[in-house]
Amino acid sequence: MPSIAASQRATPPSAAALGGLYPPFRFSYVEENLTRGAYPKPRNFRFLRRLGLQTILSLTPKPPNDALQAFCAEHGIRSIHLPVVKAKETIPFTYSKCAQIVSVLIDAAHLPMYVHCLDGLVVTGVVMMCLRKLQHWSPTTAFSEYMRAGPDAPDVGAPEFAEKFPGEIVIPPCIPAWLW
């Protein structure tokens, strides 16, 4: 059997040559068709496109930048912006605002969805803890998930906020099977 010289062997193209698939910082799956992470950058768009997203939910002080808006428009992705200030020393929103956000998350008409804040940590993390409370997770388990997203998360009172979250939200007409 003839041997092929090392220089003649076919080498697979590099990830960069293929365009690369780069998930957003702190990307993770929350539930089927629900993902979360940090503010997506253009290098993340190819990865996000492969998720078949219906919606990108931005929990940020300002509306999505031009690049993210153009990406959504080009791929038929609904962009929802719910203004939330950057977290500093406390949770940057009210229980009412959190209930509004969770109501969007559990509306099956918006799924598959990617939800993000600026850093994918405090704002998104607290919202996910409140979603987990709605799903009857124990506070300890919900906080453990929060810490996995960023063990260096600042102490802004996330566990206390989620524990006191009343869970009084508007249930949309069509909810995902994973909710309850």
Where are these regions (language model features)?
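Cys-dependent protein tyrosine phosphatase-like superfamily
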Residues: M1-Y114, D119, V126-W180
